[in-house]
Swiss-Prot record:
Descriptive protein name: Gamma-crystallin S
One Pfam short name: Crystall
Gene3D superfamilies referenced in this protein's UniProt entry, alphabetically: Crystallins
GO molecular function: structural constituent of eye lens
Subunit structure: Monomer.
GO biological process, one term: lens development in camera-type eye
InterPro entries: Beta/Gamma-Crystallin (IPR050252), Beta/gamma_crystallin (IPR001064), G_crystallin-like (IPR011024)
Known function: Crystallins are the dominant structural components of the vertebrate eye lens.
Region named Connecting peptide: 88-93
Gene: CRYGS
Record's comment describing the protein's domains: Has a two-domain beta-structure, folded into four very similar Greek key motifs.
Length: 178
């Protein structure tokens, strides 16, 4: 376990079998150590794991726990190549502003709570820009926290590409809490 209390272990096979790779800090490319990843143990902290090297491709947010097969973290396949610890601010405060248009224009909604459906809660089809005022959040491509994920730290995002998306297709979001 690192000084910050973060640790993640990747296993080649399901149910924590086969070769393993232990990590306690950000790693831009571990696929040379493991040809595939079918299970993970997060023993400390919350982690963002990525399909490709250099924190690229599909991303999955994994809080502390055990994931005996890749379907448990909503993985599309057994390929993972990089990871980074998610650093949560102290104080436990959360606040986000979402906008129906880019550059913080159009209707704005502010919340401090998770949202399983932006259509039901805010009557919006998409999010085109946002300001993360407090905390760390995850945007999801589909309602009920499903689909592609995007990690948002405290800053302003003028357009979807700023949070790593090709389109404004965000249908749900939630806070990362420990």
């Amino acid at each position: 376990m690192s000084k910050t209390g973060t640790k993640i272990t990747f296993y080649e096979d399901k149910n924590f079998q086969g070769r393993r790779y232990d990590c306690d800090c950000d790693c831009a490319d571990f696929h040379t150590y493991l040809s595939r990843c079918n299970s993970i143990k997060v023993e400390g902290g919350t982690w963002a794991v990525y399909e490709r090297p250099n924190f690229a491709g599909y991303m999955y947010i994994l809080p502390q726990g055990e994931y005996p097969e890749y379907q448990r973290w909503m993985g599309l396949n057994d390929r993972l190549s990089s990871c980074r610890a998610v650093h949560l601010p102290s104080g436990g405060q959360y606040k986000i502003q979402i906008f129906e248009k880019g550059d913080f224009s159009g209707q704005m909604y502010e919340t401090t709570e998770d949202c399983p459906s932006i259509m039901e809660q805010f009557h919006m089809r998409e999010i085109h820009s946002c300001k993360v005022l407090e905390g760390v959040w995850i945007f999801y491509e589909l309602p009920n926290y499903r689909g592609r994920q995007y990690l948002l730290d405290k800053k302003e995002y003028r357009k979807p590409i700023d949070w790593g998306a090709a389109s404004p297709a965000v249908q749900s979001f939630r806070r990362i809490v420990e």
